[in-house]
Amino acid sequence: MSNIIDIKAQESVTALEDISVQGEKDRQEWSQKAEVLCEALPYMRKFAGETFVIKFGGSAMGGSKSLKNFAKNVVLLKQVGINPVIVHGGGPQIGSMLDKLNMKSSFIDGLRVTDSDTVNVVEMVLAGSINKMIVSEINAASGKAVGICGKDGGLIKAKKLSRTKKDPDSNIEKILNLGFVGEPYMVDPEILGIFEDSDIIPVIAPIGLGDNGETFNINADTVAGAIAAAVNASKLIILSDVDGVMLPNGELVSYLNIVTARKMIKDGVISGGMIPKVETCIEALESEVGYAHILNGSVDNILLMEIFTESGAGTMIL
């Protein structure tokens, strides 16, 4: 009998020890959460009432997990008093749809040549499929999102993008024909102002309207920068599939000013697809946007880490 009592007593002691250990883990976890909240609170107060334009790239969407996490982050921003305006891309998704339709697609200097048939597919994928997918995820995360494109209400007036390239044989600058690839020349901020004073989060597809009713395919980074300037946003945030501006040794550049950013482009430190992103940020800053950020949108809670922590998580240009 005494052996049974000893065993039961030992089991009780073990159970109490387990509870004690679990209790300590819970206390540590809650303490960490409290520290995070204390660090975030000053930033929440600082940015309440401010407008952030967030570009969510097609390459940053990854799988449904990345999109769901993005939606939750955006809803939280709205709930703490920040006004997020979402602009999305969709390059990989457009390419996939064109392949399914057996439509050939070519690029010149990183820009998709967009003929009349291609622009219809671009509009269908951007303003239809992707836009509504993002809207649905934000709504599922207890937010209120409305999807629009630049043609709606004349939000984005666009013109044909003019690009030239030097012919290697004749050394003459020749005009490139990119079809219905456009650039915004006017953004109507009044349309977005309607959403600012409500619970609604606007989700914008980068399609523009020409003066003659044409539909233009516009680079999403460019659209985000133009909208940020038009609404006097305090932040332009570009979410892509890279961590930010990187040095040749692989080190992340956490902070950049405009002068240094331009020098890094000139010296070739910033190259490839990062150049137009940084140039968009510079143009936005020169148009009185407060700060610009480039982040890896595939990282969970990247928006919250960048906005609400002192260390940040990507590259901030100021």
Regions found by a protein language model. Name each.
Residues 313-318:
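Long, charged amphipathic helices and adjacent flexible linkers at domain junctions
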